[in-house]
Amino acid sequence: MSAPFEERSGVVPCGTPWGQWYQTLEEVFIEVQVPPGTRAQDIQCGLQSRHVALAVGGREILKGKLFDSTIADEGTWTLEDRKMVRIVLTKTKRDAANCWTSLLESEYAADPWVQDQMQRKLTLERFQKENPGFDFSGAEISGNYTKGGPDFSNLEK
């Protein structure tokens, strides 16, 4: 079994004051830098379909309404190397046309260049999923790739 698309092609991160976030077709990843030596019991993390909240040692780091809905039961968080919290959210709408422009409705928006790169990456990931025999991890894309690229579903095979 080959590695996931994002492992082969890299990710397009959106930097924030507390770390970064990035997305794939199916998931949104949030990486929060916390003080070294942080213990799991120091972390309070609430994940709901449209809301996320994270506090470390009683200090609120992240809280708000998500850009779009997620599957609450599939959201997870982990503490890695006692210095980073990784939150993984599963998107409700899992297609290339659903490229989040920001993490929260009013905060942590990707700048126009990062947004463009995210849309390109999701479109390539879509092509990879539709054509598993090809490797699009090193491919470049230009032209019509916004909203997931062209729709070929009605073409005859």
UniProtKB/Swiss-Prot annotation:
Compartments (UniProt record): Chromosome, Centromere, Kinetochore; Cytoplasm, Cytoskeleton, Microtubule organizing center, Centrosome; Cytoplasm, Cytoskeleton, Spindle pole
Membrane-spanning ranges: none
Modified residue annotations for N-acetylserine: S2
Region described as Disordered: 134-157
GO CC annotation: centrosome; cytosol; intercellular bridge; kinetochore; mitotic spindle; spindle pole
Annotated CS domain residues: 14-104
Sequence positions bearing Phosphotyrosine: Y145
Described purpose of this protein according to its UniProt entry: May regulate the LIS1/dynein pathway by stabilizing LIS1 with Hsp90 chaperone.
Identification of the protein by name: NudC domain-containing protein 2
Organism: Mus musculus
Native organism taxonomy: Eukaryota, Metazoa, Chordata, Craniata, Vertebrata
Name of the gene: Nudcd2
